[in-house]
Amino acid sequence: MYIVQIASECAPVIKAGGLGDVVYGLSRELEVRGHCVELVLPKYDTMRYDQIWGLHDAYRDLWVPWYGGAIHCSVYCGWVHGRLCFFIEPHSGDNFFNRGCYYGCPDDNMRFAFFSKAALEFLLQSNKRPDIIHCHDWQTGLVPVLLFEIYKYHGMGNQRVCYTIHNFKHQGFGGPEILWATGLNREPYYFHYDRLRDNFNPFSLNFMKGGIVFSNFVTTVSPNHALEVQFGDYGYGLGHTLYLHRHKFRGVLNGIDYDIWNPEIDRFIPVRYTAQTLENKAKNKKALRDRLLLQDVDKPIVAYIGRLDEQKGVHLVHHAIYRSLFKNAQFVLLGSATERGIGAWFAHEKSYLNNNPDVHIELGFNEELSHLIYAGADIIVVPSHYEPCGLTQMIGLKYGTVPVVRGVGGLVDTVFDRDYDPHKLPEQRNGYVFYHTDPAALESALDRAIDLWYTAPDQFRQLQIQGMSYDYSWNYPGKEYLEIYDFIRHR
């Protein structure tokens, strides 16, 4: 099968969040399974050119229709860790992708509307006819609209589109100028409730809604999140649209890259280990304490790794620090704040707890240190308010670090409470789950994890081993996406 991924990110060359990891991980898994995969990406000035091998201009004269004229583009070709990627660079006064950033510009809607148009124009002019076009998030939500409304009539009528939504919070909006620019000229037709018109603002077009309505299949990043966005508040206004298209909507759990996140081969940790040599985890725990100047005592280490913001349940992260100390545990935090007020709050906590031998707060992100924390900690907390999939808990399980999570989104699909999960046998349970957003709920789960570490170390070790036995690689998601591709090809 010939598959083209159209996305605004692909790790490690373009990475602002988890989207880049998913695009790369899925592409690699599909290639391992014997399929031809190519990626089409914007050529940002800030992307990591050192991660591209053999970059060269492959198509010098791509003219993309835009408003009443056309914008001249160059298309560069190169290999990103074995994946064949095409990077589109427009030559215009707008400098769409020479902004010193990936996102955050006032005209992001125009930037990515143009990218969607340019990606399809490139496929058309280069005579590429993939079986499947897989696009991601609002930035490429117009791809299926443009494909089936314009490019279908220029020889691209046999392609099928799978559209994956990673974050419903950011949907992409625009006015009629988007239609004029891209050639979708029938304004009353597209400003219709069943097409692109936003469900809240009748004067706005919604890119993500367009992707849902016009694509052949829609996925999000976990089965439980697929239910949340239809019937809860997490669809951010698109719940009814998703429900209407539920026959082509499914949650597919993301995977993690076990070539990177695997204690058996991890190059960032001093002592490698497996479930059979779990005693070596203690050596990494000592190395973590030595590096962070924690006192070397017989206590569990509780950790948090991730952003410090409301989505991640920052108030519960803060509470977990002091609750861990109260329960005679140590706490390690590695995170960066997205808001100035939260950053100042945790900077104050770092200063206040600076002389406490049982706490270390590291503000910012350090990939090497994150590996050591996963390998050295006993428990990891993921108290998210909103978590479409979540990778932290999957990595923790692989490293034998018991997750304590809030039962939301993909956390429900991956962590099963040791004491109370009614759907799993005791030998299939792998962590602790709480559901409410108050500190008492967090305590109900965190206390049980710490108490088990102290009172029943053999049972705690068994819980670690059970967690390490789960396979959250790209193996199963890759298989599921291939089933979706086959389904829409033969509809």
Curated annotation (Swiss-Prot):
Keywords: Glycogen biosynthesis, Glycosyltransferase, Transferase. Its EC number is 2.4.1.21. The keyword Protease does not apply. GO terms for biological process: glycogen biosynthetic process. ADP-alpha-D-glucose binds at residue 15. It catalyses: [(1->4)-alpha-D-glucosyl](n) + ADP-alpha-D-glucose = [(1->4)-alpha-D-glucosyl](n+1) + ADP + H(+). The keyword Ligase does not apply. Pathway: Glycan biosynthesis; glycogen biosynthesis. It is an enzyme of class 2 (transferase). It comes from the Bacteria. GO terms for molecular function: alpha-1,4-glucan glucosyltransferase (ADP-glucose donor) activity; alpha-1,4-glucan glucosyltransferase (UDP-glucose donor) activity. InterPro entries: Glyco_trans_1, GS/SS, Starch_synth_cat_dom. Pfam families: Glyco_transf_5, Glycos_transf_1. Belongs to the glycosyltransferase 1 family. Bacterial/plant glycogen synthase subfamily. Synthesizes alpha-1,4-glucan chains using ADP-glucose. This is Glycogen synthase 1. It comes from Synechococcus sp. (strain JA-2-3B'a(2-13)). The lineage of its organism: Bacteria, Bacillati, Cyanobacteriota, Cyanophyceae, Synechococcales. The gene is glgA1.
